[in-house]
From Swiss-Prot:
It catalyses: N-acetylserotonin + H2O = serotonin + acetate; N-acetyltyramine + H2O = tyramine + acetate; N-acetyltryptamine + H2O = tryptamine + acetate; melatonin + H2O = 5-methoxytryptamine + acetate. Keywords: Chloroplast, Chromatin regulator, Cytoplasm, Hydrolase, Metal-binding, Mitochondrion, Nucleus, Plastid, Repressor, Transcription, Transcription regulation, Transit peptide, Zinc. Interacts with PP2A2. One of its GO terms (molecular function) is protein phosphatase 2A binding. Belongs to the histone deacetylase family. Regulates lysine acetylation levels of plastid proteins related to photosynthesis. Involved in the regulation of the activation state of RuBisCO, which is controlled by lysine acetylation of RuBisCO activase under low-light conditions. Associates with alpha- and beta-tubulins and deacetylate alpha-tubulin. Does not seem to be required for the cellular patterning in the root epidermis. Involved in the regulation of melatonin biosynthesis by catalyzing the deacetylation of N-acetylserotonin to produce serotonin. It comes from the Eukaryota. The gene is HDA14. This is Histone deacetylase 14, chloroplastic. Residues 62-392 are annotated as: Histone deacetylase. It is an enzyme of class 3 (hydrolase). GO terms for cellular component: chloroplast; chloroplast stroma; cytoplasm; cytosol; mitochondrion; nucleus.
Length: 423
């Protein structure tokens, strides 16, 4: 079979630097959000009664955290960073730290049964030619055992990849369903966390890219709009790499705000600070490349000075999070200095922000993270943050690995973003 069935995504070379002069302040585009009502109260007729696979109203009322698991064990390449050991390592850490329903009863809910995403769900974001091409490629993957589906890129497929990717997208959509349903009856709904793979934020509308097959967060965003009638979606992507796929999917959409923090100059070379969206979507994309060596201080500063005011001004109906754990100082694929404590702080602050701006509606989606120890400890501490419990990051983090952050460069990047986006 010819791999021409899989469309190789467009690659934009170059640094994710801070050059560029586009500025939404000059056009007063930011003022349009002041005319919008707060997204903290929505009219949604969706009920879990319409989907017997989802939790009951009482289960949702009792839960503080809902998670789903799609480990995609068949989607695996030995020695590849994005391998089948990732999600089981997280699940094992949750068990060891007593952060599962077995130990917490109704406080934590695992969404064990959910509908698989359909081709139509995927086609809300991706070209059908790509989706059907990937499905057909499964025959070749079955014969060969493993194929590469991104031209010369690193994204692989096995015979189960297509179905595994549909399941991953469905797991995220089901959490969106559950969180929105819970918010109809509570001002403090549970947070969702999709422990899924393959990851999604690099997958562009026309094809796979950077270990990613389907854009899980992007698909969930469209699902929230089209199934539940939510209008404005705020996406936070704190993976160490720019979420170019999500960026591309919504670059002209004024109702989806995409905000990415990522290491400057890292793969895939996109995410310049001057990329603020196009057409009607100009001003609803914010890219903030961080200099190598940025860590906890940098991210906490970015959160308070960039992420919070953007969300407050945009007034979303839900926050979706591309939760990549590869900015950790121990991760082998990048050069930032996040710690387990950084991820605890991010989860805690995002939960607080969601409660302030959108009635607590928030779902996290696993993206990167390739050191199994730092990945699993950081997700476990994120769970603690979402439950309102104290961090245990000090048991894992080692200050000896850290060095001074380049805060002058960080401050320059923040000021540039503030100037461009009128913050």
């Amino acid at each position: 079979m010819s791999m021409a069935l899989i469309v190789r995504p467009f690659f934009v070379p170059g640094s994710a630097g801070i050059s560029g002069s586009r500025n939404i302040c000059k056009k007063n585009q930011w003022r349009k959000y002041l005319l919008k009502p707060s997204g903290s109260s929505i009219n949604c007729s969706f009920s879990t009664e319409k989907n017997p696979l989802l939790p009951s109203i009482q289960q949702l009322a009792d839960a503080r955290l809902i998670y789903s698991v799609s480990a995609a064990l068949g989607h695996n390449k030995e020695s590849h960073p994005e391998c089948s050991a990732r999600v089981p390592a997280i699940v094992n850490a949750l068990e060891m730290n007593e952060l599962t329903p077995k130990f917490r009863g109704s406080q934590i809910l695992e969404l064990a049964n959910f509908k698989t995403a359909t081709v139509e769900d995927i086609a809300n974001v991706h070209d059908k030619a790509y989706v059907f091409g990937l499905e057909k490629a499964m025959d070749e993957a079955s014969d060969s055992g493993l194929i590469f589906i991104e031209g010369s890129g690193p994204t692989y497929a096995t015979s189960t990849t297509f179905q595994d990717s549909l399941i991953a997208a469905g797991a995220g959509m089901a959490l969106v369903d559950s969180v929105i349903a819970a918010s109809r009856n509570s001002v403090d709904p549970p947070i969702g966390f999709a422990l899924i793979r393959p990851p999604g934020h690099h997958a562009v509308p026309k094809g796979p890219m950077g270990f990613c097959v389907f854009g899980n967060v992007a698909i969930a965003a469209r699902h929230a709009q089209r199934t539940h009638g939510l209008k404005r979606i705020f996406i936070i992507d704190f993976d160490v790499h720019h979420g170019n796929g999500t960026n591309d999917a919504f670059t002209e959409d004024p109702d989806i705000f995409f905000l990415s923090t990522h290491q400057d100059g890292s793969y895939p070379g996109t995410g310049k600070i001057s990329d603020i969206g196009k057409g009607k979507g100009e001003g609803t994309t914010l890219n903030l490349p961080l200099p190598g060596g940025s860590g906890d201080i940098a991210m906490r500063t970015v959160f308070e000075e960039i992420i919070v005011p953007c969300a407050q001004r945009f007034k979303p109906d839900i926050i979706l999070v591309s939760a990549g754990y590869d900015a950790h100082v121990l991760d082998p694929l990048a050069n930032l200095q996040f710690t387990t404590a950084t991820y605890y702080s991010l989860a805690k602050d995002i939960k607080r922000l969601a409660k302030e701006v959108c009635g607590g509606r928030c779902v996290f989606f696993l993206e990167g993270g390739y050191n199994l120890e730092s990945l699993s400890s950081s997700v476990a501490d994120s769970f603690r943050a979402l439950l309102g419990e104290d961090s245990l990051a000090s048991e894992f983090d080692n200050p000896a690995y850290l060095y001074d952050e380049p805060m002058r460069k960080v401050r320059d990047a923040i000021q540039r973003a503030k100037s461009i986006h009128c913050l």
